[in-house]
Amino acid sequence: MNTVATVFTRTLPLLIAVTAWAQQSPLVYPGGHGPGRGKHVVLISGDQEYRSEESIPALAQILAVRHGFHCTVLFAVNRQTGKIDPNTIDNIPGLEALRHADLVVLFARWLELPDEQMKEIVDYTESGRPIVALRTSTHPFNYRKHPESPYAKYSYDHKQFSGGYGRQVLGETWIAHYGAHQKQSTRGVIPAGMENHPILRGVRDLWGESDVYEITALSGDSRPLVMGQVLMGMDPASPPDPAKKLMPVAWTKTYTGSSGKPARIFTSTMGHVMDFRNRGFRRMIVNACYWAVGLEKKISATRSVEFVAPYNPHPIGVRGVAP
């Protein structure tokens, strides 16, 4: 990993070409002009279903080009082929980038990384630096083959370290689908008292194809920012399901690790690849990145969150599609 793929482009074909030859290297979008200039964001794509290998680079482009953040994108890479492979759960090259990161955007699901890679994530987590976590990141790790690993306690269903990384660090672990998967979508409802939170500045008409995840009780000092209303169909005009109550789909909390420094955490259980087509969702995630690094006073309700390159993602499913 001596090579770094540097991409600063408005065209998807160039992104595809660079990714094709640089899949063992981080994908880097240098920060442009904007309030985020000087902040380094490392974005990790490591889920098997929701096409984060397509949505996360698109988010990184927005953060870099529209807002000035320097962005490094890391992917799950097949050890045999050297290609991006979301179904690979034991290899995310380039995690050394976390040593110099100001923020991590995490999109992971049931990874079982080797100890030397997991150490980079845990060291970052314990350092007091912030995390923005999406969708399946409530259950990012699952140590089944190597329960002897010192990092096995971060498994989503760990009993002693209750709920593993998801519950302890981010606020909740995997419980169940609450809305019917791929049949019921989510309308975001902002609860009373949260309307003026900086993360929600300019956020309107929040909707996504994600089904609502079940939440038992958010841990620590978690504060729900958005509640998810289960809709009867996969259209924003679908009526609410009268049998379903509201569940948190976005919240903030702090996590204090071994450094003794409290870290800002933002978690959303939305994050379906099609959710990113919703401007309100994109703005919420971009705003969360500002808030996480202490730039909440710089959040604008009108600064562009439009895609830099055409965004025509593949449908979700447990298979790999290299960006």
Specify the residue positions occupied by each region the protein language model found.
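Bacterial N-terminal signal peptides
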Residues: T9-A20
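Extracellular ligand-binding/catalytic regions of CAZymes and related secreted enzymes
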Residues: Q23-G36, E54-S55, I62-R66, M232-P323
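Helical hinge/lid and interdomain linker segments adjacent to catalytic or ligand-binding clefts
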Residues: L27-G32, V42-I44, Q48-F141
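Nucleotide donor/acceptor-binding cores
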Residues: K39
